[in-house]
UniProtKB/Swiss-Prot annotation:
InterPro entries: Mtfr1 (IPR007972). Its main location: mitochondrion. It is a peripheral membrane protein. It comes from Pongo abelii (Sumatran orangutan). The modification Phosphothreonine is found at T30. The gene is Mtfr1l. Mitochondrial protein required for adaptation of miochondrial dynamics to metabolic changes. Regulates mitochondrial morphology at steady state and mediates AMPK-dependent stress-induced mitochondrial fragmentation via the control of OPA1 levels. One of its GO terms (biological process) is mitochondrial fission. The modification Phosphoserine is found at S41, S103, S110, S224, S225, S238, S261, S273. GO terms for cellular component: mitochondrial outer membrane. It holds the Pfam family Mito_fiss_reg. Keywords: Membrane, Mitochondrion, Mitochondrion outer membrane, Phosphoprotein. The lineage of its organism: Eukaryota, Metazoa, Chordata, Craniata, Vertebrata. This is Mitochondrial fission regulator 1-like. Phosphorylated by AMPK. Upon stress, phosphorylation by AMPK is sufficient to induce mitochondrial fragmentation. It is found in: Mitochondrion outer membrane.
């Protein structure tokens, strides 16, 4: 009886349809296979040891980020938990990060390299400080020299002024300064003018050489000679001033010409143009010789 019942038992959706009396359950059963799906099974790889499986977590965590960044190979085509090295054997190094070929860029390493390039070295800093100290020392020396020249130039017209009360003291100074200024050679002034300038004797020597000048009968002659000497001194002082001005102009012109020549020699553009000009000139000469 039970066997007959088991054989008679038929699923509802396998019965033949009977017109409009067919239920929705029968329609779903005929269209969908109502059978359980196979369970998912995981296969263990034979090459992985038990120690590696214990040490590595099955799910990647935030601790894997450093390993992913320091890995040499691409990591998008494999399972990270299978190829991650052991914690006690893995030691990241900057060389691995620089030589890796990963899709994720290492921004931290590039920033560190840029900072290292921007920081100047200690020897360069010490050298620049030494150069600055040397330049300041040279500037102070130049300032002292210029100040001494200015002081000497300001003292010379006072001694050479014709209205000075003491005539005997500035005359020897005038003789020495006059000789030094007239000995300078300028392109605008010829040597004949220097030769034609007579040497003026000092007034004390004239008075000592002629003792009769102190007598009352020679006072008029002495006064006239002193006036002539004052006029000649004023002319000589103006001539000395003009010589000093011309001397300064000549020095400035020489320094400007020297600076221009040095700038032209040191300018890289001038050197390159000169080399190119010579090169093309040689090429043109060779072409002309071949044509002839």
């Amino acid at each position: 009886m039970s066997e007959m019942e088991a054989s008679v038992t038929i699923p509802i959706w396998q019965n033949k349809p009977h017109g409009a009396a067919r239920s929705v359950v029968r329609r779903i059963g005929t269209n969908l296979p109502l059978k359980p799906c196979a369970r998912a099974s995981f296969e263990t790889l034979p090459n992985i040891s038990d120690l590696c499986l214990r040490d590595v977590p099955p799910v990647p965590t935030l601790a894997d980020i450093a390993w992913i960044a320091a890995d040499e190979e691409e990591t998008y085509a494999r399972v990270r938990s299978d190829t991650r090295p052991l914690r006690h054997t893995w030691k990241p190094s900057p060389l691995i990060v620089m030589q890796r070929n990963a899709s994720v860029p290492n921004l931290r390493g590039s920033e560190e390299r840029l900072l290292a390039l921007k920081k100047p070295a200690l020897p360069a800093l010490s050298r620049t400080t030494e150069l600055q100290d040397e330049l300041s020392h040279l500037r102070s020396q130049i300032a002292k020299i210029v100040a001494a020249d200015a002081a000497s130039a300001s003292l010379t017209p006072d001694f050479l002024s014709p209205g000075s009360s003491n005539v005997s003291s500035p005359l020897p100074c005038f003789g020495s300064s006059f000789h030094s200024t007239t000995s300078f050679v300028i392109s605008d002034i010829t040597e004949e003018t220097e030769v034609e300038v007579p040497e003026l004797p000092s007034v004390p020597l004239l008075c000592s050489a002629s003792p009769e000048c102190c007598k009352p009968e020679h006072k008029a002659a002495c006064s006239s000679s002193e006036e002539d000497d004052c006029v000649s001194l004023s002319k000589a002082s103006s001539f000395a001033d003009m010589m000093g001005i011309l001397k300064d102009f000549h020095r400035m012109k020489q320094s400007q010409d020297l600076n221009r020549s040095l700038l032209k020699e040191e300018d890289p553009a001038v050197l390159i143009s000169e080399v190119l000009r010579r090169k093309f000139a040689l090429k043109e000469e060779d072409i002309s010789r071949k044509g002839n």
